[in-house]
Every structure is written in C-alpha cells, then in structure tokens.
C-alpha cells in the first residue's frame, strides 16, 4: 500500500497510519477494478508540488462536489469553482483508482484524488445504502462506497462519475 502511494504521489505525501483503519480497498468508481483509499498528510515543504496545476492528481472537497439532480435529462452545470488547495498538516484521503488485473497495485494505476475535508475515522468499504440510492438515483454500475465517521457524523463518500461526493447517513443503520 505504501508503494502504491509513493508510485502515484512520489514524496509529496506521507501515509498517516495513526489509526488501525487508515486505509480501505473497494471498487469505488464501479469499473470492476479494486481501488485504494488511504489517509495521508502533505510532506514537509511539498505544498507547491501538491497544489501544482500540473500535478498528476485532482484535489477535491467532496462536500462541494456537484451532484446532478436525479431523473433529470437536461442538467445545467454550475459555474466552475476555484481549485482546492491542500494546507500544511491537513489530513487528506488519497484515492487511487485501480487498473487491470493487479488493480491498485498495478504500476499503471495512476488516476488519483486527494480529498480534503473527507479524512475520517472507521474507514470501511460498503455497498450504497437505500438512502444514498434514493437521494442520488440508480448508479450506472455496481460499486462500493467509503463509509466513515467524519466530524461526529456517519456518512459515505461515493463516486458520481465525475467526482467524489459526501452523503450523510443515519447513525442508526450502517450499510
């Protein structure tokens, strides 16, 4: 897992393994290849590389992701927002999309995201809940979601087809 993070992000981030559940694997984007999500922090003096417009990853806040209205055939996209920037010491969730038979371990697996305001506790791979499917609509393919505790709330991170988005879930039932 450390090798995959180093392969994709080089020396710009460090794995934060302070909790027992600091990483999780699942097919988060629904392409039948297992992906990896792992807690990381920016490496000392590497913020300019992390935040570079030429970086090989996308920095995103799932709380600000555009989620198209369900069951609507024509959707008007919102105006573009300013790019997200990583701050010193910020805990992030790095997601590496898998590729081929080796999945996230494949040397060619390079599609990656750094998710801000999304690094929680109790990371787990789960199936989309009925609540998420009711709010988002039917997913175009089977996929997993990243279930977690974030700021005292239980919720999931899910792939919309263009970005990762946050969906709060009931704390009583975990799917």
Give the predicted meaning of each segment.
Residues 1-30, 34-175:
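Beta-propeller-forming repeat regions
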């Amino acid at each position: 897992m450390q090798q995959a993070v180093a392969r994709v992000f080089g020396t710009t981030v460090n794995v934060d393994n302070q909790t027992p559940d600091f990483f999780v694997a699942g097919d988060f984007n629904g392409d039948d290849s297992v992906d990896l999500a792992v807690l990381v922090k920016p490496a000392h003096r590497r913020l300019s590389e992390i935040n570079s417009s030429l970086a090989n990853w996308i920095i995103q806040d799932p709380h600000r992701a555009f989620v198209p209205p369900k069951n609507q055939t024509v959707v008007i996209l919102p105006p573009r927002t300013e790019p997200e920037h990583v701050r010193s010491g910020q805990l992030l969730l790095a997601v590496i999309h898998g590729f081929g038979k080796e999945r996230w371990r494949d040397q060619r697996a390079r599609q990656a995201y750094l998710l801000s305001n999304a690094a929680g506790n109790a990371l787990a791979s789960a199936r989309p809940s009925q609540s998420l499917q009711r709010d988002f609509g039917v997913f175009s393919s089977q996929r997993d979601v990243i279930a977690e505790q974030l700021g005292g709330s239980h919720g999931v991170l899910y792939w919309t087809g263009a970005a990762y988005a946050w969906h709060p879930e009931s704390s009583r039932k975990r799917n």
